């Protein structure tokens, strides 16, 4: 999905472009849950929001590999907000695809201020604890919230080869590729300290994922 970083009335903003192809219609994940109370005004997690239930939605369209790719990506960036309205399927006549992934605001240590980042970066034990703390909204069993790595471990017992293939999608993540992206972020958006933090976070989480899957 194409995005741009900009400034509006003195505030830093992200412009996310419409990703729908002509004639396509987006159905968000919540549309597939008959017990989702859509009239509450804000998203709440639907009952039974588990990997297996989401699988029953996407697998008839041949999109299980795309679901696994999404789970691996969320684990990589520590996305803690992949609720049912933060993904969807794009329909056009008899064609269906998983929508490009969107809304990753709750990723990469988004809630940490600079002082907290500095403290974590200066203490290896704190950094390791932070790496393992990222929680997934997608669960293995209803009511049991787990971190991304435990989710991957549970899925591996069901979809070993599919998960191995999904992990290949992050094979290009290395020191050079990550830094070449991070260095493009303007200084008023990301400090040098946070660049180093995100750089280390991505590489460490990639290593954790590969150890679990391979």
Q: Where are the regions a protein language model picked out?
A:
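Glycine-rich loops and low-complexity Gly/Arg-rich segments
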Residues: 26-29, 39-43, 114-115, 123-128
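Amphipathic, charge-rich alpha-helical segments that serve as recognition/docking helices
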Residues: 28-55
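Conserved kinase catalytic-core segment
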Residues: 46-113
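C-terminal catalytic region of ATP-dependent kinase domains
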Residues: 90-214
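Short alpha-helical "patches" and their helix-cap loops
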Residues: 2-9, 83-92, 214
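Conserved ATP-binding subdomain of kinase catalytic cores across diverse folds
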Residues: 1-38
């Amino acid at each position: 999905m194409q995005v741009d970083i900009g400034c509006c009335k003195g505030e830093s903003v992200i412009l996310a472009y419409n990703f729908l192809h002509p004639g396509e219609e987006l159905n968000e994940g919540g549309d597939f849950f008959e017990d989702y109370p859509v009239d509450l005004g804000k998203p709440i997690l639907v009952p039974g929001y588990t990997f297996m239930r989401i699988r029953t939605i996407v697998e008839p369209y041949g999109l299980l590999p795309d679901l696994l790719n999404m789970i691996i990506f969320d684990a990589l960036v520590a996305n803690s907000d992949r609720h049912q309205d933060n993904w969807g399927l794009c329909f056009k006549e008899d064609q269906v695809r998983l929508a490009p992934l969107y809304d990753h605001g709750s990723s990469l240590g988004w809630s940490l201020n600079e002082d907290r980042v500095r403290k974590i970066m200066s203490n290896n034990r704190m950094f390791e604890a932070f790496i393992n703390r990222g929680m997934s909204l997608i669960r293995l069993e209803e009511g049991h919230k787990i971190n991304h790595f435990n989710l991957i471990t549970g899925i591996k017992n069901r979809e070993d080869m599919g998960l191995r293939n999904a992990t290949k999608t992050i094979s290009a993540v290395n020191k050079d590729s990550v830094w070449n992206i991070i260095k493009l972020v303007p200084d008023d958006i990301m400090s040098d300290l946070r660049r180093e933090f995100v750089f280390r976070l991505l590489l460490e989480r990639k290593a954790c994922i590969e150890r679990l899957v391979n």
